[in-house]
Amino acid sequence: MGLFESNLPKHIAVIMDGNGRWATSRGKSRSEGHREGAQAIDRLMDASLELGLKNISLYAFSTENWKRPVTEIRSIFSLLIEFIETRLDTIHKRGIRILHSGSRKKLTRGVLDKIDFAVDKTQKNKNLTVNFCLNYGSRDELLRAAQELFLERKRSKVALEKPLKEKEFEKFLYTSILPPVDLLIRTAGEQRLSNFLLWQSAYAELYFTDTLWPEFDKNSLVDSLKWYETRTRKFGGLTNG
């Protein structure tokens, strides 16, 4: 495949778009589309392990998604609970670590308990980290981080006007233990970031595919990695020569 471990992105972020369109095009309900999208997450985890990827962040539910119909929201969270209940043992045995990025506000006690259990059970796993961004919005994250930094400086009696360094700020991000995003994939043809990991994706390569999320498979992932290999990453500088 021409993929070498040294060239693999250390952190891939995925905007999983197209569940609804997949369902509508087949005369199915949006809930059925989300269920099929959960199968695509399984395929992504399998392929990531096989290819040697280490960190994946998935945009599962945004802070803006609360505007959707109540029935659809209930279906999404019901699927999340089912996903954890039916797959967690296998995920754990395969050495996959689960993380959660996002606000805990608005999430029910039942959902939080399932997430916390999955995070706690898999915390020592090292083969692959899958970060579920649930009730996540990048602006919300940055505001929360700024507030926590302010409170921390106040508690520590550090002068508030002291110049702020990136590393100090990043400690308060949900993704503080993850490397920056190298590759951001968005499915279903849309070409926008939708308030997803804006700080973390500052120098990410952006890969847009028309493939709907329920149809995303190992070949789709390999295509994105081959494309990533062709990119010259400058990080604001110049290429040699």
UniProtKB/Swiss-Prot annotation:
For molecular function, the Gene Ontology terms on record are:
magnesium ion binding; prenyltransferase activity
Per the entry, the cofactor note is:
Binds 2 magnesium ions per subunit.
- Active site positions, chain numbering: 17, 65
PROSITE patterns given in the database record: UPP_SYNTHASE
Checking Pfam families in the record gives:
Prenyltransf
Q: Which InterPro entries match?
A: UPP_synth-like (IPR001441), UPP_synth-like_CS (IPR018520), UPP_synth-like_sf (IPR036424)
Please report which protein family the annotation says this sequence is part of: Belongs to the UPP synthase family.
Self-association and partners: Homodimer.
Biological role: Catalyzes the condensation of isopentenyl diphosphate (IPP) with allylic pyrophosphates generating different type of terpenoids.
- Protein name stated in the entry: Isoprenyl transferase
User: What species is given as this protein's source?
Assistant: Leptospira interrogans serogroup Icterohaemorrhagiae serovar Lai (strain 56601)
